[in-house]
Design a protein with these regions (language model features):
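N-terminal, polar/charged subdomain of small-to-medium soluble alpha/beta proteins
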Residues: 1-90, 95-136
């Protein structure tokens, strides 16, 4: 399960997608919309993605899987569109043979997605102002 979608994201769905008998650990991450940024109250976020975004997710997942023989499965999704406070914007799950590898692989996955995924975020603040983040 690797996607860029407008649909709500669920951690449990990603965990089920990677779970298997040979995996002793399933480690997950949910990046959720918070109500503030740098001391300003946030009311909502809107994400837009480049058409290549899903291909980039697949590339990152493949690299993480290839880099560690303990990785048994990877699921990762990023949401686009308007998100409310508390909504999941990024969900990742990694199944590995052992927990140490699971935590490390999930952290690398999230870090690489955050660094490489071509998405842009519009933050809307309580005072009516807005800003775009990660715009080239």
């Amino acid at each position: 399960m690797i996607s860029v979608t407008e649909e709500p994201l669920e951690v449990a769905t990603h965990e089920r997608a990677v779970a298997q008998p040979g995996a002793g650990a399933v480690v997950s991450f949910a990046g959720v919309v918070r109500d503030h940024d740098h001391g300003r109250t946030v009311t909502l976020l809107e994400y837009e993605a480049h058409p290549s975004a899903e291909a980039v997710l697949k590339e990152v997942a493949a690299e993480i899987a290839a880099s560690d023989p303990e990785v048994r499965g990877i699921a990762v999704s990023h949401r686009v569109g308007v998100l409310q406070i508390g909504d999941a914007a990024l969900v990742a799950a990694v199944a590995t043979a052992h927990r140490t590898a699971g935590f490390a692989a999930c952290a690398r996955l999230v870090d690489e997605v955050k660094a490489r995924l071509p998405v842009w975020k519009r933050q809307v603040f309580a005072d009516g102002t807005e800003e775009w983040v990660n715009c080239p």
